[in-house]
Amino acid sequence: MLKKNLSKSALVVALLTTTVIWRGTTAYAEDPNQAFTLDPMIVTAQRTETRDLDTPATTNIITEQNIKEAGYKNVFDAIEHQVGLTSTGYGDAGQDFGFSSGRTVIRGYDRGTLVMVDGIPMNLKNYNSLDGIPIDMVQQIEIIKGAAGTLYGSEAMGGVVNVITKRPGGKTQVKVKGTVGNYYKDYGVTYAGEKLIVTASKEYSNKLTHSNAYPEGSSTDWWVGKGQKNRAGISAALTDEIGFTFIYQDGSNITRGSNNDAKKVGSVYKKYNYRYDDKRIATGLTYNGKYNGIKALVGYNYRRTEGYDFAAATPGPVSSSADLSSYIGDVQKTWNLGKNTLITGYSLRRENYENLVTKANKAHRTSNAIYLSYNNVFSDKFSATLGLRGEIIDDPVKSENILNPQFQTLYKINDTTSWYINIGKAFQMPTVDSYYGKKAAAGTLKPEEGWTYETGIKKIYDNKSIKLAVFHMDFENKIGWSDKDPGTGEQYAINKGDFRNTGIEAEFTHNVNDKWRYSLGIGYGNPEVKDPSAANPKWVQDDGRIDASASVFYSISKLTSGLTYKYLGDREYYGGHDVPSRSRLTWNTSYDLTKNDNITLTMNNLLDKDNYSNRYGNLDLPYNWKITYTRTF
């Protein structure tokens, strides 16, 4: 149980006290009207800059200022608060345990979201774990919903998330920060100059004695031990057109085990007890030609995960310990043909896998693709975009030749309103290690593929934004996990069958004035799978149906305070019970003590709910708080 060194009532009193202090003082924050543009520039959806109102896709944009004022713990936390996005985590804010990876889920399709950092794919083994991205490096997060296989290739089944890091520029400054709380503490430093940004931080987490909630009568009661994570990031402007990014994280001594469940080792029962060490590196060079219309990148993504089983007959590494890496190269050229635009490009990606226990288990996969996107402006009101991607995938089991088309239209009803249609196909290969250490036979897994159809309206007027989208997803060969083998207790990858989801999403944002702003969002869908090999094939719910978010912020002078809320309801039936609804309320308050000193109080899970972070029973943290002090030099 978490130690509550400071009671909720004391924290609320402290918050109210600071609320009184700020009256009549001078503001240091930037103008909220500049920080919260309702029609932001987007670079991911079309592979070129477009305003949100001119983008024929459903989008969510999270800015650096949004992250700061909402008090999001990390990138995962920021993304899962958006409408249409759920998540699978193994604890708080996307906690990983080895390759039990926290991941972002768009519109109910698990393991079908492509996550990138500055255009470099972060997915490994089809998981999009976000834990290694330093939150202090993030400038903007762009979320593009809908199948995006045409522009971005494999794994963009439900959509794409592009995390855009900060670029050097402006005056030189150094920020030092420290955080204390009843669960987390951290400290870090960031240097930002005209040509270079460097950040480094260290995070500590306390032990959580109860981390799972299972149906009544279960003997399983998991705990999570103390842990620490070290993060570092570099962003450099080598020239006006060439940028460099480097991100590093290692997490050591992250342990978990069971309080009362044990396995028999010889004649002795030992409680489950595991440790996970995790190291990640992501780096890349980007080129953005100012005058020639050429963009290019080369990138490298690496993860090494080592698990250690203390309860084995001979304690040692777990069989899933592995090295994963990928190399990416991409170059595109934009051709301006009068009012029309043609984008052509080539992409290369190589994925590598090597098991750390059984060294013979290694594999690699190489993908080569060419793509194009042609935008035809028929009139000032109507335009259409046709995209096509051809991809050759050299796979260790079965190679594939893929063709992914996409068709989009945009109709400008007037200067403040647009209507769009977006139809796209996506494709995803089984993980490169699917046949190692598992029961599935080579060739039995089929690639996932399918279509998304959506239409929507966007309206931006009088400091208000309204978005409405209706969508249908129709995919084949969804990959999931089998039931436990009665003899070995193991699960293995299988094609679960077809997937479908028809839904609607609505969002409203209002910047009332320079002090107040709020947003409301609601989504309803029906994500289902059907296993055609079952004795009685039928559609079965596969994720939550109801998704809602809300936020309200108040800024005046030196203080900004706000509430953010996320709800996921009518969740799926799994493991003999209905997964409970998830309800999370966060209160974040930031106060500028001086021009260079800031203090922030964040209270998470304010209602102290037992929130399932996945269908398996892993829990978010109970009510917890943290106080962060930042000094700028």
Describe each region flagged by the PLM.
Residues 239, 339, 347, 361-475, ...:
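Structural signature of Gram-negative outer-membrane beta-barrels, strongest in the C-terminal barrel
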Residues 120-145:
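Short acidic/polar hinge/loop motifs at secondary-structure boundaries
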Residues 211-212, 476, 570-572, 587-633:
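C-terminal beta-signal and adjacent terminal beta-strands/loops
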Residues 377-384, 472, 494-575, 595-598, ...:
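Gram-negative outer-membrane beta-barrel transporters
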Residues 75-78, 100-105, 116, 128, ...:
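N-terminal periplasmic accessory domains that precede
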Residues 76-120:
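Extracytoplasmic beta-strand/coil segments of soluble accessory domains associated
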Residues 150, 170-171, 190-276:
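Periplasmic-side early beta-strands and strand-to-turn transitions of outer-membrane beta-barrels
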Residues 30, 180, 269-290, 322, ...:
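Outer-membrane beta-barrel signature, preferentially recognizing the C-terminal barrel domain
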